[in-house]
Amino acid sequence: MVHYAKIEKPRMTDGVSDPVNVFTDNGQLDVAWFQSNDGYWHTKDGDTFGNVLYWVEIEFPKGWSCDWKSYGG
């Protein structure tokens, strides 16, 4: 299970969202952002972009999806 900071929808600029912090069950912090042209989240290990946000169960905004094979890449 992956956790992320619940937001309605990050701001999109040129098809890429603002970064959002993501936490795995073991507490590892990754950063995710959504690319509308790809249809999935990308993560970047170990970089918070200065946004330490609260943990909630993952809840993607309507119309968003996640390709779990891309997680952690």
How should each PLM-predicted stretch be described?
Residues 1-15, 20:
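Surface-exposed ligand/attachment interfaces on beta-rich extracellular proteins
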Residues 4-7, 42, 67:
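Generic N-terminal leader/processing signal
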Residues 23-56, 61, 65:
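Acidic, low-complexity, intrinsically disordered interaction modules
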Residues 68-73:
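Short acidic DE-rich linear segments
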